[in-house]
Amino acid sequence: MRGSGTPRQFSTQLAVIGSGIAGFAASIFAVNRQIATAQVGNTGALAYTTGYLDLIGKRGGAVVVDPWQALASLRESEPKHPLSRLDAGDIRQAFTEFTDFLGACGLAYSAPGTDNLTALTPAGTLKQTLCVPATMAAGPRALAADAPCVIVDFKGLKGFSGAELAANLRQRWPQLTTQRIVFPGMERGEIYPEVMARALEVAATREQLAAALRAVAGTAKLIGLPAILGMHRPDQVRAELERLTGREIFEIPTMPPSVPGIRLRELMQQVLPQKGVTLIPQQRVTALSFEGDGATLALCDAFGPIRVHAQAVILATGRFLSGGLEAHPAGIREHLLDLPVTQPADRADWYRARYTDPRGHPINSAGIEIDDSFRPLTGEGRRYHERLFAAGVILAHQDWIRGRSGTGIAIATAFKAVTEAERFLAGRQTMVPGASPLQCH
């Protein structure tokens, strides 16, 4: 029976709770610092991401070209915003370290630059982002140059329309055209991006698709596709299709769940254990307690109960979609430790009268409070525990949707939380050279 029996006991230096971008980023930064790490979390929201890595895309409804300048402005107007509490150099290092890690593992990204890139959305609108996957990088370049390009969509694919993209971008991109083809081997019924991406792992499918693309490309120098260029080797799939078609190819995100998000999730689940992280995916921590010598996480899997003993913990459980925060008739609560949540005083004040109110909705800034070391605070303003740190959009005083800053908050605050946890662990002298990354009792 699930949950019965003697718990399996594990010990580690750092436990990361959460499997979204903040949780995986924390594990990456911990691995790079040789901190023995265990990560636990249910599915998280990674599959809902576009693959773009935003820092700050909008401020007050206006498009942000220079996110670093916007960061300085944010510090002036919103000093409690999580990004305002971080040094710009640390944020840049966090993005660089994160993208370098992904690139070394086979998922290349553009490096963080001075200005945002203008990237495409599935609806043919534009957004500002700091880094994009290499498979998407040609899109912003082609848009800026008004290069001759054809967007190709597929019969039976819902949620991605080349005609819609071309219509919405006509004034900005006059040389953009569109074509619809049949995906090889999927001539009937609905088709799905994840299935298409996995099919393109097969050489024969790539050759058939390339032939179909050549037939409709015409004089276009570039071909834009929905994000389907393989699941585990997207850069190689793109390179081969470019060779076979003789044209530069780029991806455009689809509606979620999206292939770029699934790629990230599957890459992390494959690579992090190879780097020494003990990954316990698809499981939710049911209890977290602190003792004098550490913290204990309680959870269960199909084989029974598990206890993970850690010297430090990073809480990166997200907001509502990921289950870090829960909405109840009496208010919003943090589900694991019942940490106090900064929120509107009354449920009636969660939302403004107009859905499109440019000020946003107060509920979207709800979250937990932290001190300057990113340790969660009690209602009295004291640290909940010296071993507990927090990262990601569970933090209060930020509306990541309006600011187009969700990934930036996740990556940058994970970097800070790991930095502070490393400092704490070093002070406790828990780093033992030559020790096994994780010990099982």
Language-model-detected regions and their locations in the chain:
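Short hydrophobic core segments
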Residues: A15-I17, V285, V308-G318
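FAD-binding beta-loop-beta segment adjacent to the flavin cofactor pocket
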Residues: F303-P305, V341-R347, A353-W400
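Conserved N-terminal glycine-rich FAD pyrophosphate-binding loop of Rossmann-like flavoproteins
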Residues: G41-E76, M186-A199
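A conserved FAD-binding loop/helix module that cradles the flavin
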Residues: I28, G323-I332, H385-E386, V393-Q429
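N-terminal Rossmann-like FAD-binding beta1-loop-alpha1 element of flavoenzymes
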Residues: T12-Q39
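Glycine-/small-residue-rich beta->alpha transition segments that form the dinucleotide
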Residues: T43, F303, A310-A312, A316-G323, ...
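Helical element adjacent to the flavin cofactor pocket in flavoenzyme catalytic cores
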Residues: F160-R170, A203-G218, I223, L229-A287, ...
